[in-house]
């Protein structure tokens, strides 16, 4: 008998009919002789609606109280789903994050899981019950409810799978697996049968919406057997694993687009040691991640440094740098929020010459200008104007998945 952890996102549990469908999937898995732990997200737009309600009451509500409020969305999902499963004649129990033993740090709204006390879940499984767990939440050392931030339910599911030594962790979404690009916006996108942890991590980090990078990092660390599939189609999904059979044949596994990007340029910096350190240490102290970096040296012993941050961090980054203008000594600061990042990812890229050239040629042929470039062993990213982003993804995808024929 296998132990299977299943996770269902907000779109999968959005209304009564979809909840019944999720209950059917869970009970069918259980009837095959498996133990089942299912992690559920809040229904549809529930979390956004709760945030709006909070803003009406107090736009400056504390993060602790926001976590108390937002955690209720997932609790509604698990209790309704449990009622549905009960009505089908199965034994089931729903558990909030704290009841499931999900222990976190005290970073309200962005908590990290420290460990999981699995005794309660195991006790319920031993009673042959289906266990439903509220995703996205836990409890800290002060017995306060915390939420895990973006991707929290994915992370909850993978963490539970690791702690329970589950045989499989299935992530159910509204698409039936991991595609070479977003099938909702890119013509010709193909589903992948399998993908490596490293490739999935890069795609998740570069804007692919299927899995959150935190959950992929955890799955890789604990070697969790991971599968992404649709709660609607019933078709086989995509397996995410350490090594895939098709790796030697594959140059590029996917093309991702990220519009949550802003470009910041510091112009007229002194060309001397320590300047870059000063800039990026200031941002790091405030938790602002920097991605693509470009430095250019002028003829007048000055230099310019350009870099990208999340668009949501751009205003804060601009404020921090302007406050330290005298210490950093720059002539001008420019912020451009009308940009997007296009990335190609593939484990086979490192050993195949010409991949970057092919990407750049595709963009050139489409008349798209490249503003910045970043490369690693399995990823190439370029910054383009936001208005060109959709065309850029389509052009690059068309070139690779006809040129190399890989999927």
Question: Predicted regions: what is each one?
Answer:
Residues 211, 222, 233-239, 314:
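Surface-exposed amphipathic alpha-helical tracts and adjacent flexible/coil segments at the periphery
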Residues 237-407:
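A conserved regulatory-domain signal marking ACT and ACT-like small-molecule sensing domains
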Residues 168-172, 226-228, 291, 372:
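Short hydrophobic alpha-helical runs that function as membrane-insertion/retention elements
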Residues 41, 231, 295:
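Conserved H-loop
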Residues 224-235, 259:
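Active-site C-terminal subdomain of aminotransferase-like
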Residues 34, 90, 224, 288, ...:
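Short phosphate-binding/catalytic loops that engage adenosine nucleotides
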């Amino acid at each position: 008998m296998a132990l299977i952890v299943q996770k269902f996102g907000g779109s999968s549990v959005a209304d009564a009919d979809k909840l019944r469908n999720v209950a059917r999937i869970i009970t069918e898995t259980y009837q095959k002789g498996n133990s089942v732990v299912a992690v559920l997200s809040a229904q549809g737009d529930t979390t956004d609606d709760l945030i709006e309600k909070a803003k009406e009451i107090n736009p400056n509500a504390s993060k602790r109280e926001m976590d108390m409020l937002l955690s209720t969305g997932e609790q509604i999902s698990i209790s309704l789903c449990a009622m549905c499963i009960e009505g089908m004649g199965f034994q089931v129990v729903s558990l909030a994050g704290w009841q499931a033993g999900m222990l976190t740090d005290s970073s309200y709204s962005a908590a990290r899981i420290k460990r999981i006390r699995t005794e309660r879940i195991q006790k319920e499984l031993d009673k042959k019950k289906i266990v439903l767990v509220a995703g996205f939440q836990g409890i800290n050392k002060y017995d306060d409810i915390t939420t895990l931030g973006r991707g929290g339910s994915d992370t909850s599911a993978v963490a539970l799978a690791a702690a329970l030594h589950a045989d499989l962790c299935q992530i159910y979404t509204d698409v039936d697996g991991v595609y070479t690009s977003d099938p909702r916006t890119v013509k010709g996108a193909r589903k992948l049968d399998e993908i490596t942890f490293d490739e999935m991590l890069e795609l998740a980090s570069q804007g692919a919406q299927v899995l959150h990078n935190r959950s992929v990092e955890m799955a890789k660390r604990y070697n969790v057997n991971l599968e992404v599939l649709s709660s609607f189609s019933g078709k086989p999904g995509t397996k995410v694993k350490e090594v895939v059979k098709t790796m030697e044949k594959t140059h590029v596994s996917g093309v991702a687009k990220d519009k949550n990007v802003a470009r910041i340029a510091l112009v007229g910096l002194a060309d001397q040691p320590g300047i870059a350190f000063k800039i990026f240490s200031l941002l790091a102290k405030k938790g602002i991640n920097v991605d693509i970096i470009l430095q250019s040296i002028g003829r007048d012993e000055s230099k310019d440094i350009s870099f990208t941050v999340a668009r949501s961090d751009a205003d804060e980054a601009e404020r921090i740098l302007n406050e330290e203008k005298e210490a950093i000594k720059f002539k001008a600061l420019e912020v451009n929020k009308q940009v997007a990042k296009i990335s190609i990812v593939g484990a086979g890229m490192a050993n195949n010459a010409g991949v970057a050239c092919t990407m750049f040629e595709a963009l050139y042929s489409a008349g798209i200008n490249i503003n910045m470039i970043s490369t690693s062993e399995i990823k190439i990213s370029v910054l383009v104007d936001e208005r060109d982003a959709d065309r850029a993804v389509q052009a690059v995808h068309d070139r690779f998945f006809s040129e190399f024929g890989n999927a």
